[in-house]
Amino acid sequence: MSRGTMPQPGAWPGASCAETPAREAGAAARDGGKVTAGAQPRAATRCPAEHEEDMYRAADEIEKEKELLIHERGISEPRLSVAPEMDIMDYCKKEWRGNTQKATCMKKGYEEVSQKFTSIRRVRGDNYCALRATLFQAMSQLAELPPWLQDLELILLPEKLINKYTWIKQWKLGLKFDGKSEDLVEKIKESLALLRKKWVSLAAMKTAEARQTACDELFTNEEEEYSLYEAVKFLMLNRAIELYDDKEKGKEVPFFSVLLFARDTSNDPEQLLRNHLNQVGHTGGLEQVEMFLLAYAVRHSIRVYRLSKYNTEEFITVYPTDPPKDWPMVTLIAEDDRHYNIPVRVCEETSV
């Protein structure tokens, strides 16, 4: 898709590929030559066309891994959602040591990215990965506060929408809020208020170093971090409702929204919530077409180096394809279409 094409429905993760558990620790390595630490079982996507590794796991596996990590490093050490930066080619050599066709493709992809960026930050690969990588990049950039966050109506949005669309009460709160009998409207209002508060604080910082340090700290606070994801998911639902209503009224809408509501599992916003957004963070991540919706929700264009698509027109994919000129851009790296890492430190000799 690179700079002008859309991913076809058959290429979306989840459109035609069944997710099955990889019951042997070495399954991922056999699949493409990638070295995985700790021999932890993962859920793997087995697509007939590409057989790409799925970095996502079930919620209970994620919690077990967290307990193990806490036990190993001690409870006092903060959990890292976004790892410290390291040289991008050192990371590639560490992760892709094999000589399989996939490993070779990944190495060439990383070599290409290294012409633009010198370092990488690994993002924790749970079912919030796409949200985490995008939001971390957007909030850590030295830029002004986005205008949409300054809208006084933002915090009133949950009450307004839930009063109009009672089916939103089907909303499934994230992992950190399971089992809590909090009022849904109040919980989402709190999440949106937190998103605004943290972004305002970061935008007021004068140096990139100060902003980066504060953002790193924010993404080690699990309760606040997961609350931010609830806010972003609600913003995604709000944009989906707006786009669906415009489409029903015959107004011109972005092409991705036509595809979004053409799926059997998301013919309307209610189905999108029940079958897709409610699963994000629990049993699934964002599909390709939902990356467009994420971009529209936070009003940032998302440029992704899709390493598995090296040497094709889809190697660099931008969501949306033709973003408004005033939208900031975040850049991510994807080894597959589910897990995203963050490239950092632009090479001085490039303008990208």
Swiss-Prot record:
Outcome of substituting residue 96 to R: In Gum(W96R) mutant; defects in embryonic angiogenesis. Embryos appear normal before 11.5 dpc but die between 12.5 dpc-14 dpc, probably due to defects in organization of branching vascular networks in the head and trunk
One GO term of the biological process aspect: protein linear deubiquitination
Motif interval(s): PIM motif: 52-57
Disordered: annotated segments: 1-49
Knockout consequences: Embryonic lethality. Specific deletion in immune cells leads to acute systemic inflammation characterized by rapid weight loss, increased levels of pro-inflammatory cytokines in serum, neutrophilia with all the hallmarks of emergency granulopoiesis. Specific deletion in T- or B-cells generates healthy mice with no overt inflammatory phenotypes. In contrast, specific deletion in myeloid cells results in a strong inflammatory phenotype, characterized by chronic inflammation and autoimmunity, caused by sterile autoactivation of inflammatory pathways.
Post-translational modification: Ubiquitinated.
Catalytic activity: Thiol-dependent hydrolysis of ester, thioester, amide, peptide and isopeptide bonds formed by the C-terminal Gly of ubiquitin (a 76-residue protein attached to proteins as an intracellular targeting signal)
Positions of short motif PDZ-binding: 349-352
Family: Belongs to the peptidase C65 family. Otulin subfamily.
Protein name per Swiss-Prot or TrEMBL: Ubiquitin thioesterase otulin
Organism: Mus musculus
Gene that encodes it: Otulin
